[in-house]
């Protein structure tokens, strides 16, 4: 499990969302590299109880774009649980879409082929697929949390779709939640602006938070004064503080 010096506010807000104690169901996490976004996404997954389906997607690896997201969600939740979506895919495939064997490799390949058409036809097909996909999600008996990491690494089309279409669909279904993290984050649209909360991860300068972290990870070789020096040296940037602590701990073990 990833240990944190201090992300109490974000974790508490996430738990409130899942319990229905706040109105928001969309959480945007913005921070530069090294501030612990990815580790926080993993912690969000752990906080999901057995009554909630978490779906983690790293958007920087989604080179197939929208097709990858559809396919990834299906793989995590179970392809058979999307009967309407699968039927719509079959209808498109049986309507004359040309499929070459060497193109049917990788996640989302069939969906990619279906969407590999001129813009107007692509828009129509995507609308049809999106509609039945979210209709299938409405039939799930448990809430679903989509955890989308590295939004800044998404293709331009995928980022725009998440911002304008995906999150709008999430807003319509009270059993759906979405966490989107990145160095940049989606801009709220009228469909979901009243259902989102934005968190900007800051540097962690709180001494007590780092003292607790050092104790949790077993770095008993540091005094509080030494920890203070390391925090100030890198101005509380979490990844850099951790790197200094780990490096100093290894050096002391070798002495």
List the model feature ranges, each with a label.
Residues 23-42:
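Walker A/P-loop nucleotide-binding motif
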Residues 197, 215, 219-255:
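Amphipathic alpha-helical "lid/sensor" segments that cap RecA-like P-loop NTPase cores
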Residues 40-42, 46-141:
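Conserved phosphate-binding/catalytic loops and adjacent sensor/switch elements of nucleotide-binding enzymes
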Residues 26, 119-182, 193-194:
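Conserved Walker B catalytic segment
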Residues 7, 38, 237:
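Short, conserved phosphate/pyrophosphate- and ester-handling motifs at nucleotide-, phospho-/glycolipid
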Residues 197-208:
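Conserved AAA+ ATPase "SRH/arginine-finger" region at the nucleotide-binding site
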Residues 3-17:
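N-terminal pre-P-loop "Q-motif" helix
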Residues 183-199:
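Short regulatory helix/loop adjacent to the ATP-binding pocket of P-loop NTPases
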């Amino acid at each position: 499990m990833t240990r944190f010096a201090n992300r109490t506010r974000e974790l508490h807000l996430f738990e409130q969302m899942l319990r229905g104690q706040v109105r928001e169901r969309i959480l945007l996490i913005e921070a530069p590299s090294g501030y612990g976004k990815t580790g926080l996404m993993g912690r969000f997954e752990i906080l999901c109880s057995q009554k909630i389906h978490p779906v983690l997607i790293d958007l920087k690896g989604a080179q197939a774009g929208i097709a990858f997201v559809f396919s990834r969600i299906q793989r995590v939740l179970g392809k058979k649980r999307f009967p309407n979506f699968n039927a719509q895919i079959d209808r498109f495939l049986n309507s004359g879409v040309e499929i070459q064997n060497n193109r049917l490799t990788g996640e989302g390949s069939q969906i990619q082929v279906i969407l590999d058409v001129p813009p107007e036809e692509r828009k129509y097909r995507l609308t049809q697929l999106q509609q039945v996909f979210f209709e299938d999600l409405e039939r799930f008996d448990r809430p679903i949390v989509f955890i989308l990491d590295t939004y800044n690494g998404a293709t331009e089309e995928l980022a725009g779709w998440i911002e304008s279409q995906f999150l709008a669909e999430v807003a319509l279904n009270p059993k759906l939640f979405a966490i989107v993290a990145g160095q940049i984050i989606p801009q709220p649209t009228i469909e979901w602006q009243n259902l989102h909360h934005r968190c900007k991860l800051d540097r962690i300068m709180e001494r007590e938070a780092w003292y607790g972290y050092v104790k949790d990870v077993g770095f008993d070789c540091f005094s509080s004064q030494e920890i203070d020096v390391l925090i100030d040296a890198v101005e509380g940037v979490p990844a850099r503080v951790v790197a200094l602590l780990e490096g100093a701990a290894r050096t002391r073990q070798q002495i």
